[in-house]
Amino acid sequence: MLKSPYSGGHLEVIVGPMFSGKSEELIRRVTRALIARQRVQVFKPAVDDRYHESAVASHAGRTVGALAVGDVADIRAHLSGEAPLLQASAEMPDVIGIDEVQFFGPELVPLALELADAGVRVILAGLDLDFRAEPFGCMPDLLARAESVEKLTAICTQCGAPATRSQRLISGEPARFDDPVVLVGALESYEARCRLHHVVTR
């Protein structure tokens, strides 16, 4: 679909564990919007610099240009034209994509709603659960308010079943429940696991 099936602005949320293809799906949707000659702007948290500083990148290596921002205030400033250092937008995009939304604060929720109310297609991708399998950041609120939700699964590294959890590993061992929630990493720190094989040390 070049156009979303929803008329006017709306929220699309893509969730799942690490290695489930969330960024890949965001890139796919954004690329289709670009082919359809829609105005598109993609944002990513500056803290996520694993693969590329100025692009959303999938684990498979696909990329789409993105603006790295420190927080939601930076997104607002860019969209309002008050952020010369962030290449302020001349006009409101038709489509806004935001990757790794779990790293943004709760103020992302009202911004996403405002954008949708203004007629923007907002595509949000991120983890729904943290490494402890607890709801992650602002994602539960976004899921409740979205018109469209796609929950992806990965493959459990232990048994090959569909994986819905992100297993954090520290020196090869499961992380402790009271470890910091945010730890940016990839294969060196995380594995996809099913419910049965997801382990959190207490």
Swiss-Prot record:
Zn(2+) binds at residues 156, 159, 194, 197. GO terms for biological process: DNA biosynthetic process; thymidine metabolic process. ATP binds at residues 16-23, 99-102. The active site is at 100 (proton acceptor). InterPro entries: P-loop_NTPase (IPR027417), Thymidine_kinase (IPR001267), Thymidine_kinase_CS (IPR020633). The keyword Nucleotide-binding applies. NCBIfam families: PRK04296.1-1. Homotetramer. This is Thymidine kinase. It comes from Deinococcus deserti (strain DSM 17065 / CIP 109153 / LMG 22923 / VCD115). The gene is tdk.
